[in-house]
From Swiss-Prot:
This is Major DNA-binding protein. HAMAP family: HSV_DNBI (MF_04007). GO terms for molecular function: single-stranded DNA binding. Its main location: host cell. The keyword Iron does not apply. InterPro entries: DBP_sf, Viral_ssDBP_head, Viral_ssDNA-bd. Residues 536-584, 1214-1235 are annotated as: Disordered. The lineage of its organism: Viruses, Duplodnaviria, Heunggongvirae, Peploviricota, Herviviricetes. Keywords: DNA replication, DNA-binding, Host nucleus.
Length: 1235
């Protein structure tokens, strides 16, 4: 995307459209399922989905005409809001909506309590006659549903009722299998600028010409929805209390490009200051910071949203695998509902986490984090950056405020004494938008109930029984099974605690992840990148070719040693330039000094060849044929992994350093494309909150730099802002996106003018429609676009100077005897029946009895000698793994086992002794639940006289076959990178850390550091209260919640590397031929691989393809196929094929009695280095290798890793060593990948 042309991404066209369509019941139900609806409102907030709410080829970015001049029009770039508003004839959609009680009254009460501004329709203006508008486009109003989509730049005009529909340009488009009429909407500035009266050119919510008054689209219900869903929410993010002022400012900002002027500061109120004990200087610093970041975020929201974006893959509704795979409409609704249930985990995190982005909008001055100012009364920028933080703002929602003149204004609301989290808090953070509150309540009715044990489930049961009296505050007894009061009773144990004191915490955000990542155990260390890759990488260009820093984020220093918020890295750790790479100008990583991925790929190749994992999916394919086979396979695997770890230690000692290993950084990217979450309006709402949080956090750096040098000397904060804001704006625009956290890019146009045929707006204002050629100018030749934010984690804890290691990372060796609880426990569970047929005991109990020497004699265990060897092997492997285990995470598949073993051995061999931090992805799953905990399955408001009657009714539901309700839970992914490879929606806590550059530079950098969820009700897998007092894994492990979107909403991209069935067979055949399994003829294994997926004998051309063109080998295989045909063999199992084709070899082996020819002398190395053992190459077979602090010999590897004093002869680590240090004649040489 680095070579995109602005004119191609954003064609000339209207930035708002009306759609007139006739919706059938199926489409209405789909819209009700995906949209935000409430019974009290006729407006439905629907997702912006191509093929459902807009046409399939809908362009999300346009250059829209805004102003006229003689002979042409001036266009501005804008992108469409990621939602659509249905507002006429929506009864059919709302009818499918669940009733949640009187949500409208709840929102009104919240406005009164928190003194929020309410929407007031224009008293002297008549709403647009929608029936006449429908008739003008040939539609019948009683059968036509109307909805609008609008660009970010024009949404204020839509709110003001000033957009002009041009019915003469109506066109027919297709929406979800039906036809719709699309009518463009134009801004009033195109017509106002032609009026003779100069005052008519004034852009305002109230000033309108007679033409706009008569023709403008004014729907009060739409304006009200925008007022609460968009603007009240934005005001909360910006700590601004007057939405109408913000709307007016946004209106003029888009038309007049007034981003560099002060717009909000004169009207701003400073909330949350009264509960802080601040000196006058601290208060001045906090007020100025508050005003600056608010103004910058408001200005740059216009800059970033009025830009050019590409449609996200997840907004193509007609191509969703979920849609294309549905068999009928009911199956589609079931799949869409299950998708929403998956999303309930993310919604729960946003509601139940006290550090959610919904609440993190208060700016505070943390005195404990600040250093005392110098005697001169000044403070440094670093001091302010540590002191001024964003925190939970619920506790300060009812405080007195300061105005622009720093005078105290009394709070005008009606605060309650009980400040426990309740429905009004939810209404507050939803901007008192009924549709949004109702959307949250739907999810709260379907998340799991966490009982405390004190009252169990009796609280919910008693509430439902009490509903029979009809005294419910939410619904009056009409819908108590689904109302918001019942929802809050269900989740009362999971609700967040309103904090009494502010504190610095990470912020929980929900966005879509990007594909590229560095999240394996050691992240960026030892990873080499393809700088010329099309999509870039985490090295220099970043995801999608973003310039400006590698995974280290632009270079810098580790500013202190101690843990930050209990994280694995030092405070500021992870933000500096990454170790393990050579940093170029601007922090760009050019390449790692060592290649860890080479070693890992060798291990993975070995696993493929040994048939331990699937060559394509990576899933386990190992099948234990017996205890001896199990021991042989994993003894060889462990030896190979350990040898690779030793070899890598030698390579690192030659080419790298311990500091580089300790500086390893894990990193992943979060997508800021607004259309990545356009499939759900609730997520779109959270997206805007997240973007404002990101911009304001980054803006703090610019704000503090000017505040330190320019103290407040006037009575008005806005006056100081007027004096300095233009410089502040310029500084932020040039530095905000090149400091390691926020990534943007400039999309440029090669020309500033063009010619096309457009509507003659002068004639249209006079009542005549005409299309004429005219010049089209572009107001800006380049626009900045949001790309992503990068989040990091330092896995290896680095203690500060003079500090002992943290107790959270100290490793205490506790022997673990039971193999079922050890590193290979997942295989013992999986193959228990095969290893011990007819055992009669489950796996865990069996091994408990074995380890306790209490296994009954009547339990069949097979040959005693074989069993003893098997148990000794497992005990030894378990003890060895635990001795070197620095991850403290039990493997659950072969891939995670070999990766963990390799890194554990490498780190221990290299001298690391403490636990390291780790990243974990928790992906959502659906499980069945108890009917009694999900009252929505009752179908009607409860009318029970006692708990016993309710229990009997629930039992009747089960007897009647009512399906058990489903709820989302999570499971840990074996490999966290799969979260990003499956394009997941993720909820992750992020803290934005700031630190100074190297060499006493005044540059301040920032990085996103993964943090923690605050509260016990977020997700039970995150809770730590059930752990023992000495278990500190929760301080070392960082989690993100994920829902996979690949193959659900995103069609998996195949690109050019499609693997057909023949390719898969060829891969398996070549792996079988490469395998060094002495127990079976490799050709017989190849025959088995071919016949395992075919029912007939293959043709010779096919066999020639499977063996990569080797004619002699193909002829040999064809002889075996001919033998099978002659004998009429139909059983193609491996055992039968060996019996038929490998019988002679088996007889020879049995007759030899295990004796073999001694041919070792033929393979002994020769030459000068053979006798001396230089590079580990002169060892005889079976000879032991001595290892010490400076020499690690690797048996069977030439050049595999001795640390040589004079290594100049071969930089790879030994005479004759390979370039990777991996050896040329090792145990299993690396071969060219055939995948």
């Amino acid at each position: 995307m680095s070579h995109e042309e602005l004119t191609a991404l954003a064609p000339v066209g209207p930035a708002a459209f009306l759609y007139f369509s006739r919706l059938n019941a199926e489409t209405q139900e789909i819209l009700a399922t995906l949209s935000l609806c409430d019974r009290s409102s006729s407006v439905v907030i629907a997702p912006l989905l191509a093929g459902l709410t807009v046409e399939a080829d809908f362009g999300v970015s346009v250059r829209t005409p805004v102003l006229c001049y003689d002979g042409g029009v001036l266009t501005k770039v804008t992108s469409f809001c990621p939602f659509a508003l249905y507002f006429h004839h929506t009864q059919g959609i709302v009818a499918f909506t669940e009733d949640h009680g009187d949500v409208h009254r709840l929102c009104e009460d919240a406005r009164q309590k928190y003194a929020l501004e309410a929407y007031m329709p224009e008293a002297d203006r008549v709403p647009t006659d929608l029936a006449a508008l429908c008739a003008a486009v040939g539609c019948q109003a009683s059968e036509t549903t109307v909805h609008v989509v609008v660009g970010n730049g024009l949404k204020e005009f839509l709110f003001a009722g000033q957009l002009i529909p041009c019915v003469e340009e109506a066109t027919t488009v297709r929406l979800h299998g039906g036809e719709a009429v699309r009518v463009p909407l134009y801004p009033p500035t195109l017509f106002n600028s032609l009026q003779l009266d100069a005052e008519a050119d004034e852009v305002s919510l109230d000033a309108r010409s007679a033409f706009v008054e008569a023709r403008g689209l004014y729907v009060p219900a739409v304006s009200e929805t925008l007022f609460y869903y968009v603007y009240t929410s934005w005001c909360q993010s910006l700590r601004f209390s007057e939405p109408r002022v913000l709307i007016e400012a946004a209106l003029r900002q888009f038309v007049h490009d007034s981003q560099q002027s002060v717009k909000l500061a004169p009207h701003k109120r400073y909330l949350g200051y009264m509960s802080q004990r601040l000196s006058s200087l601290e208060k001045d610093h906090l007020m100025l910071s508050d005003a600056v970041v608010c103004e910058l975020a408001f200005s740059f929201a216009s800059v970033f949203f009025d830009s050019a974006y590409q449609p996200a893959e997840s907004m193509l509704f007609s191509e969703w695998p979920l849609v294309t795979n549905a068999t009928d409409h009911r199956d589609l609704i079931r799949a869409l509902t299950e998708l929403k249930l998956h999303l309930s985990t993310h919604v729960a995190a946003l509601v139940f986490s006290a550090n959610s982005v919904l609440y993190q909008h208060r700016l505070v001055y943390l005195q404990s984090s600040a250093r005392h100012p110098s005697a001169g009364g000044t403070a440094s920028q670093e001091t302010l950056l540590k002191a001024i933080q964003f925190t939970n703002g619920l506790s300060a929602a009812c405080e007195d405020v300061y105005n622009d003149a720093r005078k105290v204004l009394k709070f005008q609301g009606a605060p309650l004494k009980d400040e426990r989290y309740g429905p009004q808090h939810l209404a507050l953070v939803c901007g008192t938008c009924p549709q949004l509150v109702s959307g949250f309540v739907w999810y709260l009715n379907r998340v799991s109930v966490y009982n405390t044990g004190l009252s169990g489930s009796s609280t919910l049961t008693n509430h439902l029984v009490g509903c029979a009296a009809g005294l419910c505050e939410a619904c009056g007894g009409t819908c108590c099974h689904t109302c918001y009061q019942t929802a809050f009773v269900r989740v009362r144990t999971r609700l967040p605690v309103v904090p009494k004191q502010p504190k610095k915490e990470p912020c929980v955000i929900t966005v879509q992840s990007r594909f590229l990542n560095d999240v394996d155990i050691l992240g960026s260390f030892g990873r080499r990148y393809n700088v010329d890759a099309k999509d870039g990488g985490l090295d220099g260009k970043g995801d999608d070719g973003v310039p400006g820093g590698g995974a280290g984020g632009g270079g810098g220093r580790d500013v202190s040693g101690g843990p930050s918020d209990g994280l694995g890295g030092g405070r500021g750790g992870g933000g500096g330039g990454d170790s393990g790479g050579m940093m170029g100008r601007g922090g760009r990583m050019l390449g790692a000094s060592v290649d860890r991925t080479y070693r890992l790929n060798r291990i993975l190749d070995y696993c493929r060849k040994m048939r331990l994992i699937d060559p394509v999916t990576g899933e386990d394919t190992f099948s234990a044929h017996g205890k001896s086979d199990f021991v042989a396979v994993f003894s060889a695997l462990n030896k190979f992994v350990d040898d690779e770890a030793l070899g890598f230690v030698s390579e690192v000692r030659l080419k790298s350093s311990r500091d580089e290993v300790a500086g390893a950084t894990q990193a992943f990217n979060l997508d800021l494309n607004p259309y990545a979450v356009a499939f759900q309006p609730l997520l779109a709402y959270a997206y805007f909150r997240s973007v404002f949080y990101v911009i304001q956090n980054v803006a703090l750096i610019t704000a503090t730099s000017y505040i330190v040098d320019n103290p407040l000397t006037t009575n008005l904060v806005s006056k100081w802002m007027t004096q300095h804001f233009q410089s502040i704006h310029g500084a932020f625009s040039t530095t905000s996106s090149r400091k390691g956290f926020l990534f943007t890019k400039q999309i440029k146009s090669s020309k500033n003018s063009d010619h096309d045929r457009l509507l003659d707006f002068r004639l249209y204002a006079q009542g005549t429609y005409a299309v004429v050629p005219m010049e089209i100018k572009l107001s800006r030749l380049s626009v900045p676009t949001l790309i992503m934010v990068r989040v990091k984690n330092r896995p290896i804890y680095r203690a500060g100077k003079g500090n002992a290691g943290s107790v959270f990372f100290r490793r205490d060796h506790v022997p673990r005897r039971n193999p079922a609880k050890g590193c290979l426990g997942f295989l013992l569970y999986r193959h228990h029946e095969r290893l011990f047929p007819e055992c009669g005991l489950p796996c865990l109990q069996f091994w408990q009895k074995v380890c306790s020497n209490a296994l009954p004699k009547n339990v069949p265990i097979g040959d005693m000698g074989e069993f003893n060897a098997f148990v000794k092997f497992l005990v030894a492997v378990t003890a060895d793994y635990q001795e070197h285990d620095l991850l403290d995470v039990a493997p659950d598949c072969v891939l995670s086992y070999v990766e963990s073993r390799f890194h554990n051995k490498f780190l221990c061999y290299y001298g690391f002794k403490d636990y390291i931090g780790s990243l974990h992805g928790l992906t959502t799953r659906l499980t069945t639940q108890n009917h009694a905990q999900f009252p929505h399955v009752l179908g009607a408001s409860p009318r029970f006289s006692s708990p016993a009657e309710f229990a009997l009714h629930v039992k009747g539901l089960k007897t009647a076959g009512v399906p058990a309700p489903m709820a989302a839970t999570v499971a840990r992914e074996s490999l966290v990178r799969s979260v990003f490879e499956h394009r997941s929606l993720v909820t992750v806590p992020v803290s934005v850390e700031k630190y100074a550059g190297i060499n006493n530079s005044k540059e301040i950098y920032q990085f996103g550091q993964i943090g923690y969820f605050s509260g016990n009700g977020v997700e039970r897998s995150l809770n730590v209260s059930s752990m023992s007092g000495q278990d500190y894994r929760f301080m070392r492990q960082r989690y993100l919640l994920a829902t996979r979107l690949a193959d659900v909403l995103i069609k998996r991209s195949r690109r050019e590397n499609v693997l057909f069935d023949a390719d898969l067979i060829k891969n398996r055949v070549m792996l079988a031929l490469d395998a060094e399994n002495l127990d079976c003829d490799p050709e017989v294994m190849a025959v088995y691989e071919i016949l395992s997926v075919r029912e007939e004998i293959p043709a010779s051309d096919d066999v020639l393809f499977f063996v990569d063109g080797c004619e002699a080998l193909a002829a040999s295989l064809m002889d075996k196929f001919a033998a099978l045909q002659e004998q009429g063999v139909e059983d193609f199992s491996l055992e039968n094929l060996r019996r038929v084709l490998d019988a002679d070899a088996q007889r020879l082996t049995d007759a030899a009695g295990g004796e073999v020819h001694d041919l070792s002398a033929l393979f002994a190395p020769s030459g000068v280095g053979a006798a001396s053992g230089v590079g580990g190459g002169g060892l005889l077979l079976g000879e032991s290798v001595a290892g010490n602090s400076i020499c690690f010999g690797v048996p069977g590897e030439t050049g595999g890793g001795c640390f040589l004093v004079n290594a100049g002869e071969d930089e790879a680590g030994g005479v004759g060593g390979s370039s990777g240090g991996g050896g040329g004649s090792g145990l299993l040489p690396a071969k060219r990948s055939r995948l």
